[in-house]
């Protein structure tokens, strides 16, 4: 092989490596932006839930005044979520809030007069819808993170990820308490 041919092969190989790195880099940038956009949707739903909680708590407080521990935990979880600055802190605070709401639902079941309260029923319907939205947005976020993290670990993209500092993103897992949440029935009198 002549030196011209060797030089041509080296240049060709260098172009392939640079092109591959550039494509991988752009893919990572796009995936990270998608993760950020999806996290914003999760934040929107968490804020929606956070906004519903005071009305729900006030409705329950009027009837179940002796349950101060539960109300305190809910207030703490709202404050933590409001003060969280990173996705990881927000995930932790959201999981604590889910656990606190589960405790509230158990308390509420002990007060049948709440079931007939129209405002309580409306708030519970809104909360149920919001919880479903959070679950959907959490799933979409986790799908994006999983795709990104998988790309980040695959060859040759892992080289680009390492060179340019693309870090692994955390999944937004459901809280451990959610695996064993009690079933609660808030059926309204006379039907549903």
Question: How would you label these PLM feature ranges?
Answer:
Residues 2-192:
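A helix-centric hydrophobic-segment signal that preferentially recognizes long
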